[in-house]
Amino acid sequence: MAFRDQPLGELVLSIPRASALFRKYDMDYCCGGKQTLERAALRKELDVDAIEAELAQLAEQPIDKDWRTVALGEIIDHIIVRYHDRHREQLPELILQATKVERVHADKASVPRGLAKYLTMLHEELFSHMMKEEQILFPMIKQGMGSQAMGPISVMESEHDDAGELLEVIKHTTDNVTPPADACTTWKAMYNGINELIDDLMEHISLENNVLFPRALAGE
């Protein structure tokens, strides 16, 4: 089956572990989920045939859960518990670790200077963003008023783009979240945590942008 003409966001929903594959190739399937596989691969100068072959192998496996058929209320509850609550735990700990690493290893050329600042910016943006979703947008959708939520959804999508841009800054600051050979235990643990955060946040944004919001706007 040809996957190159399909949007990344659709492929993530229909193929098990496609999200991990796209993350490996640094392809944006959440904020950039509407771009086709071919376009995304060309932008990164990647071999679309090779990626398509890997997707074909993944597509042979059963998908864990097809969110395209799950009730919107259940999706919202899942987003809050799996992602919102998790981000609220992840970011304060990562900020503490980044502050320590930047202070202790200030004399090293490889230190991720500014990382604590960027993580703090992401924390502040996400804290405000998630509160707005939980207090305004999600209740509207649960009450069947999603088709009237074009304004709030547009704002949320714009804020998703802002978060995606901050993730790119964080990846640039951390050498694509790769610790140097002489990194201490805290440094390595922090980068593991940042990779987990990036995975979680991309899945979170993808589920909202590519499933929840379109279905809500369609009147479900």
Swiss-Prot record:
Keyword Transmembrane helix part of the UniProt annotation? no
GO biological process: one example = protein repair
Q: Which InterPro entries match?
A: FeS-repair_YftE, Hemerythrin-like, RIC_family
Cellular localisation: Cytoplasm
Enumerate the UniProt keywords alphabetically. Answer: Cytoplasm, Iron, Metal-binding, Stress response
According to the UniProt entry, where is the signal peptide? none
Q: Name one Pfam family in it.
A: ScdA_N
Which is one Gene Ontology cellular component term of this protein? cytoplasm
Molecular function per GO: metal ion binding
Q: Which CDD domains match?
A: Hr-like
Cited PANTHER family:
IRON-SULFUR CLUSTER REPAIR PROTEIN YTFE
Function summary: Di-iron-containing protein involved in the repair of iron-sulfur clusters damaged by oxidative and nitrosative stress conditions.
The subunit field of the Swiss-Prot or TrEMBL record says: Homodimer.
Give the similarity note: Belongs to the RIC family. YtfE subfamily.
Q: What is this protein called?
A: Iron-sulfur cluster repair protein YtfE
